Amino acid sequence: LSAVPGLEEALREAVERRAVPFLGICVGMQMLATTGHEYRQTPGLGWIGGAVTRIAAPGLKVPHMGWNDLVIDHRANGPHPVLDGLATGDHAYFVHSWAMQVADPAHLLAHADYGGPVTAIVGRDTILGTQF
């Protein structure tokens, strides 16, 4: 974020203050987290609490590449509207070595299994992210 002067401020103005919808895809989803740990600890936007860490999947190939079944995570306050039309068992294609560990389970909308649960979709309010 710091590599592009004014980018973080512009994003915060639009998304936090004006509630402009935001969709982060792949690394864009990872930027939503509080911190990232790729090469060094780096602050993220902090819109979805959590950390991005290297996938730990003993016996499995990293980067994680391929089709995986989505598992829709049921939240206490009901499904997020972005999930309308998606069901557990639907497929998504992943190419990544790093995964978000979400702090608040209410923000985890879907995951895939790859040596354990791997975050696939996160969201809150008008902020969404997909790893695929």
Where are these regions (language model features)?
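Cysteine-nucleophile active-site neighborhood
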Residues: 1-67
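Amide-donor transfer/coupling interface in amidating biosynthetic enzymes
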Residues: 11-17, 51-132
